[in-house]
């Protein structure tokens, strides 16, 4: 019983590592690699989400966020509104503006 519980907990945690947020769960991802980092970017209306698919150990959060924003902008061809950026080291969400060049 204990082994089954531990296995279930591990699978639950691992499943959360590359799962989009609820608002983007039905959106098909666009994979993009920037440098050594791969992201799944999902776009829904004027919002985008970049989900990092690999690790960036020891990299400052500001740098991780900047790379995720670059991934969103390259996939969408739109600009990310800086004041709209939210998230954590693994997932960044932002509002995009496709009328800004």
Regions found by a protein language model. Give the residues of each.
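Intrinsically disordered, glycine/charged-rich N-terminal periplasmic/extracytoplasmic linker segments
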Residues: 49-101
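Post-signal peptide N-terminal segment of mature Sec-exported envelope proteins
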Residues: 26-49
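Solvent-exposed, flexible loop/coil residues
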Residues: 5, 38, 89
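Detector for Asparagine
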Residues: 15-18, 37, 99
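Signal peptide cleavage region of secreted peptide precursors
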Residues: 18-28
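Sec-dependent bacterial lipoprotein signal peptides
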Residues: 1-20
């Amino acid at each position: 019983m204990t082994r089954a519980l531990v296995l279930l907990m591990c699978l639950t945690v691992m499943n959360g590592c590359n799962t989009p947020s609820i608002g983007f769960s039905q959106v098909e991802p666009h994979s993009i690699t920037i440098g050594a980092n791969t992201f799944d970017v999902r776009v829904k209306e004027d919002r985008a989400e970049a989900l990092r698919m690999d690790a960036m150990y020891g990299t400052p959060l500001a740098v991780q966020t900047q790379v995720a924003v670059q991934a969103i902008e390259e996939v969408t061809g739109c600009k990310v509104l800086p004041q709209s950026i939210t998230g954590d080291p693994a997932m960044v969400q932002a509002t995009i503006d496709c009328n800004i060049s």
